[in-house]
A protein has these predicted regions:
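Extracytoplasmic "Venus flytrap"/periplasmic binding protein-like
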Residues: 1-56, 62, 87-97, 114, ...
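Extracytoplasmic/secreted envelope proteins and their assembly/folding machinery
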Residues: 2, 6, 28, 37, ...
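Hinge/lid segment of periplasmic solute-binding proteins
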Residues: 24-81, 130-170, 219-231, 245
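Extracytoplasmic/periplasmic substrate-binding proteins
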Residues: 28-31, 128-148, 178-299
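Helix-loop-helix "hinge/cap" segment bordering the ligand-binding cleft or interdomain interface
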Residues: 62-132, 147-194, 247-256, 264, ...
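Second-shell loop/turn segments in exported
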Residues: 92-98, 157-161, 344-349, 366-373
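Conserved small-residue motifs centered on glycine
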Residues: 257-371
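Histidine-centered catalytic/metal-binding microenvironments
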Residues: 364-409
Length: 409
């Protein structure tokens, strides 16, 4: 999708685009500096689209005081859970109430290993430090490949994450688990797939916390249980985890047409259901309770979070009928980060920033997925830092610190 969308952008073939803060190449932090998106600030007020959500959503998604993006109203705060296959919870009588931090699941991983499972701890080929440790840091880049810089919540200062005790703690734990056989080499080599979670080959993985976590049962075709491993936080990027934008090549007439269409998508349940679930009678049906029942042969594969507002998309069968109010309560119950509202402009150090991201792929990903022996974690972290510095990291860090200090004033 990213490649196709980027090509269409370059060729000026499109007016409306879905993106997200975590997307690469076409992410929100890429498009604004490139002047690739339309400033819709003056076109929004008084429209059906603007009135479809509270003003706070529009404020939270501004860049430099201007609206460029149309947030999908969903779980617009950030938090993470550990996800357990319920079958194993029942079989081994795991007491999930004892799980307060990541290391607490170690006895359960031992059970999963004895079960003969291929993936006792499934990382889903994801470097997770920047998610598991959001109680300590605001990783305002919202990108694993640049998790080497963050705001320390205790000091409200930008820090070199690689040098923190927390980073070493996490890498040591992942190395230990890999050597115990709890993490598979498949995650390190990125050969696990997006459907591995639908199998019975794993025991414990991660999940992005949402108002209705029971959605995971249908997504993974099995019952799972969730335990929060972080608090929920409102970040600069959390409300942009799924959004739309109008391309800068659009005329004002085209931009207004896009806003009119999005107003319908965010307020008309029939259109929202069609865009989210496909064709009624072919991809889905409404059950006796008026909820969505997907068909077995349905070919449409969208989800609410990437489609339309949670307040208007019809809940799926088995979901709470009051899903809309659950989302409003969920978003309202989060902590607000000290760095909420800050957006880093990487333009002054773009080449060095990109070079540091490449270094992450060389060192950071393996460190965070158990791909480094326990005896070599310290030396690898040192080599990682050295390679970052050679790539220009200190200049990038200084630019982060300068921009953040200026923003705090």
């Amino acid at each position: 999708y990213t490649d196709k969308a980027n090509t269409s952008l370059a060729n000026k073939e499109i007016n409306l685009l879905w993106t997200a803060s975590w997307e690469s190449t076409i992410g929100t932090n890429d498009l604004v500096p490139q002047n690739a998106v339309y400033d819709i600030t003056d076109l929004l007020k008084g429209t059906t689209l603007y009135n479809s959500m509270d003003a706070g959503q529009w404020e939270a998604t501004k860049y430099n005081g201007k609206n460029y993006f149309i947030p999908v109203y969903k779980d617009n705060v950030e938090g993470y859970d550990l996800m357990f296959r319920q079958e194993l919870v029942d079989k081994y009588s795991w007491d999930l109430s004892t799980v307060k931090k990541l290391a607490d699941i170690e006895p359960m991983l031992a059970d999963a290993k004895s079960e003969g499972l291929k993936y006792p701890f499934l990382t889903q080929k994801t470097a997770m430090f920047y998610r598991y440790y959001i109680n300590s840091f605001d990783f305002f880049t919202a990108d694993a490949t640049s998790n080497w810089v963050a705001v320390d919540r205790d000091t409200n200062e930008v820090v070199d994450v690689i040098q923190t005790p927390e980073y070493k703690e996490f890498c040591d734990l992942m190395a230990k688990w890999a050597e115990a056989g709890y993490i598979s080499e498949d995650d390190v080599t990125k050969t696990t797939t997006d459907t591995t979670t639908q199998t019975q080959d794993w025991a414990i993985s991660w999940w992005t916390d949402i108002p209705v976590n029971a959605e995971a049962n249908s997504r993974y075709n099995q019952e799972v249980a969730m335990v929060p491993i972080t608090d929920r936080w409102a970040h600069s990027t959390s409300a942009l985890g799924s959004c739309y934008c109008i391309t800068a090549n659009s005329t004002e007439e085209q931009a207004k047409a896009c806003i009119d269409f999005m107003g319908l998508l965010y307020t008309d349940s029939k259109l929202a259901d069609m865009y989210t679930f496909g064709i009624e009678g072919e991809d889905f049906n409404y059950d006796a309770n008026g909820q969505i029942a997907k068909t077995e042969n349905g070919k449409y594969n969208h989800s609410m979070w990437e489609s339309a507002s949670a307040t208007i998309v019809t809940p799926e069968a088995g979901e709470p009928a009051d899903k809309a109010s659950l989302y409003k309560d969920f978003n309202g119950g989060a902590n607000t980060s000290c760095a909420a509202g800050f957006r880093f402009d990487k333009t002054p150090v773009a080449d060095k920033y990109a070079a540091c991201q490449t270094v992450f792929e060389q060192y950071g990903f393996a460190l965070e997925n158990g791909g480094v022996a326990s005896s070599e974690v310290d030396s690898t972290i040192a080599a990682y830092q050295s390679a970052l510095d050679e790539a220009g990291y200190q200049d990038v860090l200084a630019e982060f610190q300068s921009q953040y200090d200026a923003w705090k004033k």
